[in-house]
Amino acid sequence: MRMNKQIVVTDWIKEKPRLGSFLKLTLTSDERKILRGKRLTDCDQEIILQLPRNGKLNDGDILSTNESNFYVEIIAKTEDLIEISSNSKNELIKTAYHLGNRHVEVEIEEDILLTKSDYVIENMLKNFKVDIVNTQKKFSPEKGAHSHD
């Protein structure tokens, strides 16, 4: 659904409304960090993000707009990632340490680490006792120690 009016996105809402129109906005993990500026929704509707500067957009977030019955739903885009696993928790922890030491964004799951596909990082990982697999998934990295959200 497209509107001719300018749609301004102003805030997060806690619960998905039962009524109203939803625009989907699919973004990468990097794009989800930027809370201000023009974007095109999945149906090519231009919107303007004017969100409070704290925080980050997450997969499934619902945002309110200047139009009372219009909402924007955030969808995390599938990205090229490296999936890192090991039979040894200790090796996985060491690997996470070295990735963090290089300021590489990492998503931590139960038995795997995920990071963005990068040939330099992939070559570094070959020096560890871990298994690496190229995959495509939604990416939600951990907040950094110096994060402002």
UniProtKB/Swiss-Prot annotation:
Q: Which domain of life is it from?
A: Bacteria
This protein's record includes keyword DNA repair: no
Instruction: Please give the SMART domains that the UniProt record associates with this protein.
Output: UreE_N
An example of a GO molecular function for this protein is: unfolded protein binding
**Descriptive protein name:** Urease accessory protein UreE
> What the protein does?
Involved in urease metallocenter assembly. Binds nickel. Probably functions as a nickel donor during metallocenter assembly.
Q: Which InterPro entries match?
A: UreE, UreE_C_dom, UreE_N, UreE_N_sf
What is the annotated localization of this protein? Cytoplasm
Q: Which organism is it from?
A: Prochlorococcus marinus (strain MIT 9312)
A GO biological process held by the record: protein-containing complex assembly
**Tell me, what's a Pfam family for it?**
UreE_N
Gene3D superfamilies membership: Urease metallochaperone UreE, N-terminal domain (2.60.260.20), UreE, C-terminal domain (3.30.70.790)
Which controlled-vocabulary keywords does the entry list?
A: Chaperone, Cytoplasm, Nickel, Nickel insertion
Q: Does the keyword Cytoplasm apply?
A: yes
- Gene Ontology cellular-component terms listed: cytoplasm
Family, similarity comment: Belongs to the UreE family.
